[in-house]
Amino acid sequence: MSFLLIVRRTHLYLGLFLLPWVIMFGVSSIPLNHQGGEGGAQWTPIKDGPFTAEPPASADPAALRALGAQMMKAADIDGGFWVYRVNAQRVDAGHPNFLRPVRATYYVDQKRLLVERRSVTLEGFLTGMHTRGGYNLGGFWDTVWAVSVDLVSVALLAWIASGLFMWWELPGTGLRRWGWLALAAGAVSFALIIAKL
């Protein structure tokens, strides 16, 4: 089997592997680019009660993460979560579920924890898939998602490289000229937009 045939098959099967991911990123880009609010998404309280955990005195991320874990436990929420200190009197934490994310707000001065769940919306579902990432959420499936995104990123780069190699191996110069034109048009338009923004 020739090297070119290996590259072609790699390109083909990487394309098939990437298909659901590329479709997801393509479709989820539409609501990100055409934002019109949350399209009727509502946050519904599911728990509202006392909470007396002491917030960390310092800006130590580990201490804040520990408080977030207590908030999630009090909210009866399993899985990965994020946590953010809004100010001295408020700490937010949340579980970024694709369909029905949950957020918990700790009002420190009131010793109160408000837990809310967002209603299901197509816009929220799609943008959640597009923007979710990172290994810092801590849940098993959150880590699986992060690893998958890394694998897809590497596969996309390999797919691009194999496509460039196949283009370069085209016989004659006529077809290669069209490739140079496409590369130049893409690079110039991208650079121009980046420079102007």
How does the language model describe each region?
Residues 96-153:
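Extended, hydrophilic extramembrane loops/domains of integral membrane proteins
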Residues 4, 58, 116:
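Charge-dense, low-complexity intrinsically disordered segments
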Residues 1-42, 143-197:
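Internal alpha-helical transmembrane segments
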Residues 73-77, 128, 132-135, 157, ...:
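A structural signal for alpha-helix termini and helix-coil/disorder junctions
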Residues 37-101:
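Membrane-proximal low-complexity regions enriched in glycine and acidic/polar residues
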